[in-house]
Amino acid sequence: ECRLLRFEVDQRHFTAAPSQTDRKYPPGGAQMLINRLKKNRRILGRWARRGDISCYRIYDADLPEYALAVDLYQGDEQWAHVQEYQAPSSVDERRANERLEEALAVLPEALEVDQDRIYFKVRQRQRGRAQYEKFDTSGVFHAVSEGTGKLLVNFTDYLDTGLFLDHRPIRFMIGKQARGKRFLNLFSYTGAATVHAGLGGAETSTSVDMSKTYLDWARRNLELNGLADGRHELVQADCIDWVRRQRGARYDLIFLDPPTFSNSKRMRDHFDVQRDHADLLQAVSSLLSEDGVLIFSNNFRRFKMDTEVLPTMSIEDITAQTIDKDFERNARIHMCWKIVRKSLG
């Protein structure tokens, strides 16, 4: 539902640090932004280190006049991925641009990240194929750590980096539950959840996605973690058609994270998660083993779960368990359910 506008940040916005005698202090609002970023970096940094987390959201429009989401990524270097939320039409465009310039000017100092490692994007509401469009061809990937795993991210070529930070608790949950399990990852994207399942001891895994690009990315992630051993299958297919074609296949742990909307030309029909989730859940739940667990997540903010769709299943809302400290300000960034067969007792 978003469109990326990508452009080079004007070098003039990042001036060399002046001497104490010549220093021009930023406007009051920008100073407030600096203070908030430094405070968040101190508090969230301690939290992240305790949890073995190297990539996290440090700021999410905490100050309404600076409507940015700022994510820190740490690998062999440190990077910042900065997204501006598109201002509503009621906001004066000139003033919004001034605030953006103020924010861009103070980010290197406040984050302690080099200017050339700050990547800036603008998010706009967008439906359809535009949200999957490729925006650059740099092909530059960086390895970051998450728990015991390593994952590749790309800051320039796509709308997102290849790692949904808000899903971190879900990936950790999958890793803890995966030992000895047959794991199925539907709409698998870059395979980050599959990496966690593999490192957690999954017996086998199957990751299904329509995109060859993302499956190649997933393959590289598996190789990076020593998991390219034949037990982890990558399938390029329309997930919905693929699920319906399965006969007799059973999985002990399934992660289902469909898009909000898709009209990809590779899909037989357009997909709308609100309209189609009931049929999708019925089909996917049929692949569960007797004691299997289905984790269903989506990021449609107005989503309403049809709890009557699976009468033989127990459906538990576990959203609160899957929102980490760095996303508490945006607690509806996704919703998540745990689905298992009802006990006959």
Regions found by a protein language model. Give the residues of each.
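S-adenosyl-L-methionine
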Residues: M210-L253
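C-terminal catalytic and target-recognition region of SAM-dependent MTase-like enzymes
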Residues: E1-T15, V293-G345
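Non-catalytic substrate-recognition/targeting regions of SAM-dependent transferases
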Residues: P64, A69-D71, A96-F164, F172
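Conserved SAM-binding motif I beta-strand of class I
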Residues: T204-D209
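Non-catalytic accessory regions of SAM-dependent methyltransferases
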Residues: E1-E84
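S-adenosylmethionine
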Residues: E1, C239-W242, Q246-E316
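Conserved class I S-adenosyl-L-methionine
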Residues: G180-Y189
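Conserved SAM-binding loop of SAM-dependent methyltransferases across substrates and taxa
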Residues: T190-A202
